[in-house]
Structure formats: C-alpha cells, structure tokens
C-alpha cells in the first residue's frame, strides 16, 4: 500500500470523527494517557501532563491543516 495515501485517509477520517463526535476527542486523549502507563512510573506522569497540556492545541492545529500537509510533516508523504 501507499503509506502517504494511507496517512491522508487516516487523518481525513480523524478530522471527520472530531467534527461529528464530541466524545471522540475525549476517548482519544484518555487512550493516549493510558498508553503513557507503559513508560513506567516517572515517565508516565510526565507523559500524561504533556498530553493534558498539548492535546487541545494539537487537535485544533490538526483540524486547520490539510491531511497531506500533516502527513508531510510527520514524514509519511514527500514534501511538495
């Protein structure tokens, strides 16, 4: 498969989910915080704080960017 296209599709789906489902973001943030627990005691708290602080900004930024640009930023698509 084409990693770039897959990324664009995933970001598009995420943006649609955020737009149409108010609890989606909350679930995503909670899931991310649960993943933090894998890092061990000291790092887990730091990870959770980071998510609490930046998740809203990150989601707002994601909502205002084109999926292709986001995928380019994270390295799944060639920058144009």
UniProtKB/Swiss-Prot annotation:
Keywords, comma-separated and alphabetical: Disulfide bond, Glycoprotein, Lipid metabolism, Sphingolipid metabolism
SUPFAM superfamilies documented for this protein: Saposin (SSF47862)
Cystine pairs: 4-77, 7-71, 36-47
One record GO biological process: sphingolipid metabolic process
Post-translational modification: The one residue extended Saposin-B-Val is only found in a minority of the chains.
Glycosylation sites: 21
GO cellular component: extracellular region; late endosome; lysosome; membrane
Listed SMART domains: SapB (SM00741)
Keyword Lyase on entry: no
Domain Saposin B-type positions: 1-80
Name the record gives this protein: Saposin-B-Val
Complex and partners: Saposin-B is a homodimer. Interacts with GRN; facilitates lysosomal delivery of progranulin from the extracellular space and the biosynthetic pathway.
Gene: PSAP
InterPro entries, alphabetized: SapB_2, Saposin, Saposin-like, SaposinB_dom
Keyword Repressor included in the entry's annotation: no
Alphabetized Pfam families for the sequence: SapB_2
Function statement: Saposin-B stimulates the hydrolysis of galacto-cerebroside sulfate by arylsulfatase A (EC 3.1.6.8), GM1 gangliosides by beta-galactosidase (EC 3.2.1.23) and globotriaosylceramide by alpha-galactosidase A (EC 3.2.1.22). Saposin-B forms a solubilizing complex with the substrates of the sphingolipid hydrolases.
